[in-house]
C-alpha cells in the first residue's frame, strides 16, 4: 500500500487543508471527551511548525445536511484548540468561496455536514474544498470507510493529496496486527450482536489462532448447547455460530454472571452456563471463563480487541471485562484496540498507556479487519501513482 505521507512534503507557505476526525461528544458547549482531538493535534502542530497556512475541518454529530445548526457547530472544538495550541485559532463559517489564512494561524472550517452534498461525495462541493488548498491531508481514519466530499472527493481534485501521520499510523498498526501478526494471535470480539460482527468474526477466524467472543455474541455461542434464559442473543445465528465454533478455535464461556433484570442495581449470581434459568440473563463472563481467557491473552504475541465481554457499565457485571482488559494490558503482546465501547472500557480501567495502539476508528476499524477497501485510502493510493 503506497500513499504520499504528509511527512514527505515541504509545507512551508502552502495552504494545507487537514481533514481530521474531531467528532467529539459535546455537552453545554464543552467537549466532554477529548481523545479524538488529542490524537489529531500532532498532525496540526506539525503543519503549523513547518510554516503552512493551516485549515482543519471535520464533521460533528448528525445535523440535517445543508442547514446550519448551532448544536453541531465546531465552536467547542475551536475553544478547546485555543486552550491547547500556542497559535491563534479561529472558526470560519462561510468558506466555500475561499478563506484567508495567515501563516502560523489555524482556521477551523465549520462542520462539513452543514454543506449540501457532503455525504453524497458531490463533485462540485469536492472541487470547492480542493480549491481552498495546495495540499489536502486526509487524517481521519474514523471516516476513511465513507466516500464523502471531505474525505474522498476533495482528494481527487486537490493539487496534492496525502495521508496524515495519524492515518498512516492507524494503517501501519492494523497492517502489523492483521497482515503479518506475531503468533499466537488472539482476537477478542465483544458487543451485543453476532449479526453486526459476523463478517469480522469470519475474517478473524482465518487470521487469528484463537477468537474470544464476549457479550451478546458469546451468548449466541452459549445457546448452541444451553438454555440462555432471557439473555440477549440471536436465535437466527445459532447455526452459523455452531459452524464457526466447530471449524475454528473459539472457546465458549463455561460460567457466567447472571441477573434477573437488566439494571445497574441487579445483583449478580455466578453460575455454570448449563444452569441458567428461564428468568435469568447472562450479563458477564464468570470467573472461570474470564481467567481461562486471561491465560490465552497472557500467552499471545498479537492481540486485537474490539468490544467488551459483559455489561461493564453496570458495576456488578464489570469483572469479566476488567479481567480481560487487565490481561491485555499486562501482556507482552503487540495489542491494538478499537471501537467506542472498547475505548470507554480502556478509559474506565486506566490502561490507555498499556495498549500498544488504540485506534480512533469504529466502523473503519471493523471494515479494515473485514478486509474491505477503505475509499479514502484507495483514493490516496491512486493519487500517489499520478
From Swiss-Prot:
Q: Give the UniProt record's GO annotations in the biological process aspect.
A: gluconeogenesis; glycolytic process
Q: What is its EC number?
A: 2.7.2.3
The keyword Chaperone appears for this protein:
no
Pfam annotation, one family: PGK
The GO terms this record gives for MF are: ADP binding; ATP binding; phosphoglycerate kinase activity
**Gene3D superfamilies linked:** Phosphoglycerate kinase, N-terminal domain
Report which reactions are catalysed by this protein. (2R)-3-phosphoglycerate + ATP = (2R)-3-phospho-glyceroyl phosphate + ADP
Q: Which residues are ATP-binding? A: 197, 313, 339-342
Residues the record lists as binding substrate: 21-23, 36, 59-62, 113, 146
- Tell me which UniProt keywords the record has, alphabetically: ATP-binding, Cytoplasm, Glycolysis, Kinase, Nucleotide-binding, Transferase
Cellular compartments annotated: Cytoplasm
> Which pathway does this polypeptide act in?
Carbohydrate degradation; glycolysis; pyruvate from D-glyceraldehyde 3-phosphate: step 2/5
Q: What is its main location?
A: cytoplasm
Q: Is Nucleotide-binding a UniProt keyword of this protein?
A: yes
One GO term describing the cellular component? cytosol
Assembly information from the UniProt record: Monomer.
Return the similarity comment: Belongs to the phosphoglycerate kinase family.
State what protein this is by name. Phosphoglycerate kinase
Amino acid at each position: 500500500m503506497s500513499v504520499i505521507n504528509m511527512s514527505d512534503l515541504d509545507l512551508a507557505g502552502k495552504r494545507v487543508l487537514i481533514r481530521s476526525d474531531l467528532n467529539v461528544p459535546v455537552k453545554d458547549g464543552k467537549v466532554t471527551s477529548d481523545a479524538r482531538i488529542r490524537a489529531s493535534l500532532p498532525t496540526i502542530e506539525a503543519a503549523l511548525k513547518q510554516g503552512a497556512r493551516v485549515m482543519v475541518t471535520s464533521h460533528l454529530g448528525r445535523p440535517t445536511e445543508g442547514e446550519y445548526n448551532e448544536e453541531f457547530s465546531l465552536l467547542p472544538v475551536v475553544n478547546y484548540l485555543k486552550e491547547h495550541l500556542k497559535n491563534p485559532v479561529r472558526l470560519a463559517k462561510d468558506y466555500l468561496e475561499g478563506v484567508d489564512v495567515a501563516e502560523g494561524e489555524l482556521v477551523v472550517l465549520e462542520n462539513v455536514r452543514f454543506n449540501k452534498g457532503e455525504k453524497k461525495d458531490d463533485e462540485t462541493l469536492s472541487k470547492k474544498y480542493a480549491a481552498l488548498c495546495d495540499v489536502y491531508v486526509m487524517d481521519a481514519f474514523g471516516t476513511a470507510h465513507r466516500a464523502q466530499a471531505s474525505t474522498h472527493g476533495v482528494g481527487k481534485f486537490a493539487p496534492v493529496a496525502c495521508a496524515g501521520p495519524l492515518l498512516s499510523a492507524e494503517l501501519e498498526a492494523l497492517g502489523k496486527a492483521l497482515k503479518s501478526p506475531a503468533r499466537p494471535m488472539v482476537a477478542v470480539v465483544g458487543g451485543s450482536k453476532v449479526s453486526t460482527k459476523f463478517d469480522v468474526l469470519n475474517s478473524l477466524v482465518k487470521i487469528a489462532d484463537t477468537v474470544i467472543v464476549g457479550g451478546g455474541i458469546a451468548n449466541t455461542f452459549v445457546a448452541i448447547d444451553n438454555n440462555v434464559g432471557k439473555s440477549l442473543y440471536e436465535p437466527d445465528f445459532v447455526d452459523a455460530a455452531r459452524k464457526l465454533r466447530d471449524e475454528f478455535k473459539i472457546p465458549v464461556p463455561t460460567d457466567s454472571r447472571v441477573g434477573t433484570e437488566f439494571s445497574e442495581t441487579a445483583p449478580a449470581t455466578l453460575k455454570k452456563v448449563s444452569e441458567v434459568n428461564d428468568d435469568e440473563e447472562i450479563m458477564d463472563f464468570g470467573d472461570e471463563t474470564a481467567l481461562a481467557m486471561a491465560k490465552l491473552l497472557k500467552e499471545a504475541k498479537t492481540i486485537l480487541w474490539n468490544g467488551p465481554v459483559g455489561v461493564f457499565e453496570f458495576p456488578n457485571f464489570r469483572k469479566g471485562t476488567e479481567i480481560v482488559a487487565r490481561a491485555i494490558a499486562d501482556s507482552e503482546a503487540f495489542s491494538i484496540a478499537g471501537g467506542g465501547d472498547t475505548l470507554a472500557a480502556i478509559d474506565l480501567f486506566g490502561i490507555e498507556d498499556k495498549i500498544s495502539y488504540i485506534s480512533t476508528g469504529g466502523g473503519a476499524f471493523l471494515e479494515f479487519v473485514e478486509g474491505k477497501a477503505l475509499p479514502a485510502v484507495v483514493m490516496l493510493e491512486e493519487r500517489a501513482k499520478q
